[in-house]
A protein has these predicted regions:
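Glycine-rich, basic loop-to-helix element that forms the pyrophosphate-binding segment
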Residues: 63-79
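Short aromatic/hydrophobic "clamp" motif used to bind/position activated sugar donors
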Residues: 84
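A short, conserved alpha-helix in the catalytic core of glycosyltransferases
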Residues: 153-157, 164-184
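Short beta-strand/loop segment that forms part of the nucleotide-sugar
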Residues: 34-44, 61
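Cell-envelope/extracellular polymer assembly enzymes that use nucleotide-activated donors
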Residues: 4-6, 37, 171
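A conserved acidic beta->alpha catalytic loop
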Residues: 42-50, 91
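Short, well-formed alpha-helical segments that are part of the catalytic scaffolds
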Residues: 14-29
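Conserved donor NDP-sugar-binding/catalytic core segment of glycosyltransferases
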Residues: 95-124
Length: 239
């Protein structure tokens, strides 16, 4: 059966988190009548990520570039579903995610969207960090964490921009939103189907790290600072 939804999961040494991510997706898939495929894009993995993905019935794609845009695009290029969904391996989607994505896209009023993101744990530092980016979220008018759209719209905007080594998701969301506006479709956010994400960045760097290092945050949000991106994403869990 040709899948209706292709879920793309970038994975760099994700043996710890990948099983829960896949299990959550399977639970969501059980609530729809359509088939799905899960594509795990292996990126420089030397742990059990590949074995775990295969054991869970996922398709495997390889992309070793230290560039999340290229990693996500590699998964999309291999996808066969008419709907593209992508989320990170350390996140767990809501059981009704796929059902709501299909419902909204069938209505034809939205071009795609994101989801509300909730941390797996709370602290004052994590809350303050979240509050600090609210103005940015308000300015962009998009949501992040988990992205969903029809394949035709993904391809129409050229997927993720490979010039970005960080905040590629923000750029993608803004371009997809602008693309939808041309045909009278808006950006959608899954408010009642939130994404639960790990706090491993806070665990590693500290709950107050982002607020105490505003210059670093500016470099990350610039999108093209290789050193900052490697420090925070690509060279993490590489030992």
């Amino acid at each position: 059966m040709t899948p209706q939804i292709s879920l793309i999961i970038p994975a760099h040494n994700e043996a710890e988190f990948l099983p829960a991510c896949i299990d959550a997706a399977r639970t969501a898939a059980d609530r729809i009548d359509s088939a799905i495929e899960i594509i795990v894009v292996l990126n420089r993995c030397h742990d059990d990520t590949e074995a775990i993905a295969l054991r869970h019935g996922c398709r495997i794609v390889r992309e070793d570039a230290k560039n999340l845009s290229m990693i996500r695009n590699a998964g999309a290029a291999a996808a066969t579903g008419e709907i593209i969904v992508t989320c990170d391996a350390d996140s767990r989607m809501h059981p009704n995610t796929f059902r709501e994505v299909i419902r909204r896209l069938r209505q034809g009023k939205v071009v795609g969207g994101g989801a509300m993101v909730l941390p797996e744990r709370w602290s004052l530092g994590i809350i303050a960090s979240g509050v600090s980016i609210l103005p940015y979220l308000a300015f962009t008018g998009v949501s992040f964490g988990l992205f969903w759209c029809e394949r035709r719209d993904f391809e129409a905007i050229g997927g993720f921009d490979t010039r970005f080594v960080s905040v590629e998701d923000v750029d993608f969301a803004r371009r997809l939103k602008a693309h939808g506006r041309k045909s009278g479709r808006s950006w959608g956010t899954l408010i009642w189907q939130p994404l639960i994400t790990s706090c491993r960045k806070f665990d590693q760097f500290g709950d107050w790290y982002l607020l105490r290092n505003p210059s670093f945050v500016r470099k990350v949000f610039r999108g093209t600072d290789r050193q900052a991106a490697d420090h925070f994403w690509y060279d993490v869990r590489s030992d």
